[in-house]
Amino acid sequence: MGGRKMATDEENVYGLEENAQSRQESTRRLILVGRTGAGKSATGNSILGQRRFFSRLGATSVTRACTTGSRRWDKCHVEVVDTPDIFSSQVSKTDPGCEERGHCYLLSAPGPHALLLVTQLGRFTAQDQQAVRQVRDMFGEDVLKWMVIVFTRKEDLAGGSLHDYVSNTENRALRELVAECGGRVCAFDNRATGREQEAQVEQLLGMVEGLVLEHKGAHYSNEVYELAQVLRWAGPEERLRRVAERVAARVQRRPWGAWLSARLWKWLKSPRSWRLGLALLLGGALLFWVLLHRRWSEAVAEVGPD
């Protein structure tokens, strides 16, 4: 990944935000996630209505770095981030310093409105499950509340219902994931063109709009996105270095540590957290004083005159 390309991609994204501040509320940021070979790049091209991301059929990744593309849809400016092999069991080898994962954060800052988990219809495998675990490790457990599952090879349904397929599948892991994602699923035929292609995009972006309404306009965020915003005006290399370090710290923590950190960050972001914290502190101090007073009274009674 060239440093200049990284800087250009990030400058393009931030430039779009600066040039569109008056309509920032209508920007929709999407991240394509999932295992290698599931069809992320082809799905991204279908969403954009143009061949923006390099794509070909195969089991190995042809995407080498996070890349962005954009389009207008209705009154929204849609930004799509395509991702390379950063969600597999080999990610510690393919991205040892977490630079590409940091790059993904920077290109989608201040946070995505939806993560699109791309998987092939009828082929939700152990690799897909591993990719979901990597997504959770990278972004946090709550990220599934912002996730839509996109099945490629819609043509294999042969006119059947996607919801019937999901409901009747014997793949327990898939059923559980769909439930965790609130039942948000759609299917794409990435060879479709014209009105058929646009109908697929309409359905998907309609789900994204539903997520935006559900979350009252809020995009997904965590402590890494917060850092990316703090460093927004730093140089691109410094920004990437700092964010990559934070991502590395997040993914290398034990699961319970990551969960605790996410809950603490969410609690601190709550407008009522300081009041609750103060109440807990005062309550603890009062309890300590009561216990201490009781022990003192008991001690006095023991040594007092008969």
From Swiss-Prot:
Annotated region described as G5, given as residue ranges: 189-191
InterPro entries assigned: G_AIG1 (IPR006703), GIMA/IAN/Toc (IPR045058), P-loop_NTPase (IPR027417)
The keyword Transmembrane is assigned to this record: yes
Localization per Swiss-Prot or TrEMBL: Endoplasmic reticulum membrane; Golgi apparatus membrane
Segments on the Cytoplasmic face: 1-272
Annotated Pfam families: AIG1
Keyword list, A-Z: Endoplasmic reticulum, Golgi apparatus, GTP-binding, Membrane, Nucleotide-binding, Transmembrane, Transmembrane helix
Chain positions recorded as GTP binding sites: 34-42, 55, 153-155, 190
Record keyword Lipid metabolism present: no
Cellular compartments per GO CC: endoplasmic reticulum; endoplasmic reticulum membrane; Golgi membrane
PANTHER family in the cross-refs: GTPASE IMAP FAMILY MEMBER 1, GTPASE, IMAP FAMILY MEMBER-RELATED
UniProt family annotation: Belongs to the TRAFAC class TrmE-Era-EngA-EngB-Septin-like GTPase superfamily. AIG1/Toc34/Toc159-like paraseptin GTPase family. IAN subfamily.
Record's function text: May regulate lymphocyte survival. Required for normal levels of mature T-lymphocytes and mature B-cells.
Protein name stated in the entry: GTPase IMAP family member 1
